[in-house]
Amino acid sequence: MRGIHAEGVVTESGFTVMKGSMVRNHEAAYAAKAILDFRHQCLNDGTIVDWVLTRDVDFNSPSTAATFLFGSNASGPASWKNAEGISMLKLDKVESGAMESTSSEYTGFFKTVEGNEGSKCHYPTRLDTYGCGCGHDCSYCYAKDMITNLSGAWDPIHPKYADIKRIETKLKKVPKGTILRLGGLTDCFQPIELQRRVTLETIKLMNRYGIGYLIVTKSHHVADQEYIEVMDPKLAHIQITTTTFDDKLAAKYEKASPPSLRVAATEKLQALGFDVAFRLSPYVEGWIDFDSLNQVKCDKILVEFLRVNPTIINRFPVQESDFPIHEAGYFHMSLERKLEVLSKITGFKEVTVCDDNSEHYEYFRDHFNPNPNDCCNLRIITE
C-alpha cells in the first residue's frame, strides 16, 4: 500500500489506527513490526491524545487505543469494541459520526451517503457542523431513530460540534464547484449555532474555496443579517423546511423555529434573490393548510413525504394503514395518494419531489420533476 506521512499509524486486518489526518498503511511484510512499535508508543508516550480508528471512532487516550487494538480475541476485528462498548459490526452499519468520544468535538462531520438514499441523491456528500444530537429533536427524525437504536448516542441538549480547522482540512481537498449539503444527520442551524457559529465559519471557508453549499434547515436564523452578508448568491442554495403552518402543533413534535418565522425567512431570501426553496418535509397527512401553503411567496417548493418504521409509528400520531409500501426498512404512502397531495399545490412556479421509494423516485424523475437529474432542483450559476 502507498505510504503517506503521519505521526503514527498501525494497520491490522484492514483497520487503520492513526494520529493526525494523514494515513500511512504499512506493507504486509512490515505489519508485525508496525504493530509492536505502535503498542510501545501508545503505552509510553503520554502526549498522544488523538489516536483514532478509521470508521470515525475516537479514543480518549493512547492506552484506550492500544487496548482496543490488542484486546481482540480470535474472532478478530468483528469482536472489537470501542471505549463505549460499541462493536465494529455496529460501527459498520451506522452513519459516520454516530459514534463519538465523550469530548464535545464532533469528528464524523464529513460523509458521502451510500445505499438506497445515496444512489438517488444528486448531492450525496454531507457536511454536518454539529452531530450526535440536534436541538430541534423532531419526533419523526430518521437520524435520531437510527443513532438512538444503534448506540444511544443521541443527545439533543448537548450536541457535539466540529472543529473548524478540521473542516478546512477537508474542504481543501474538495474540488472547486462541488456542492455539499450542510446538514445531513442534524440541522446546521440548530440552537447551538448561535453560540458556536461553526456553520457561519464553514460558509466563509466554502466561499473561499469556491464550494457550493446546500443548506437544509428548520431555522429562521439562516435569514439573519450576519448570514445574509456572508452567503454568496452564486454558491448558496437554501431549503427551509416546515411540516405545518400551525405554530402550536409544530411545537409538540419539534423544537425548531415557529413555522411562521420560517415562512418569513423563506420570503426574505426569495426577495433578496437567493436560490431558495420552501421544503415541505415531511408531508404529514392532515397537517398542512394548502391555502396557506399556496400563499407562500417563493418560486420553488420541494416535497418529501413522511416515511415511517415501527419506532416512529409508536411515537408519532400516524396510521400504519396509510403506509402500505415497504422498502429498505421504511413504510411509504402509495403513489396515488402522493399525486393527490401534489395536485393541491398550486402556488409555486416549480414543484419537485424527493422520494426514497425506488418505484416512486423513478416516476417523479421521469414524469414530474422539472429537473430529472436533480430532485433538489438547484439553480446552478456557472461563470
Label every PLM stretch briefly.
Residues N207, I228-D232, V263-G273, S343-K349:
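Surface-exposed amphipathic alpha-helices with a cationic face
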Residues A98-H237, F245-K248:
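Conserved Radical SAM active-site core
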Residues D232-I238, V296-I301:
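Glycine-enriched alpha-helix->loop->beta-strand junction motifs that scaffold or abut catalytic
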Residues A98-T102, D291-E383:
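Auxiliary Fe-S-binding modules of radical SAM enzymes
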Residues E254-K255, A265-I288:
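Conserved strand-turn element in the central/C-terminal portion of the radical SAM core barrel
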Residues L185-D187, K218-H220, T241-F245, S281-E285, ...:
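Active-site beta-loop-alpha junctions enriched in small/polar residues
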Residues T125, T178-L180, Y213-I215, I238-I240, ...:
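Hydrophobic faces of well-ordered beta-strands that scaffold small-molecule active sites
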Residues M1-A98:
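Intrinsically disordered, charged low-complexity linkers and terminal tails
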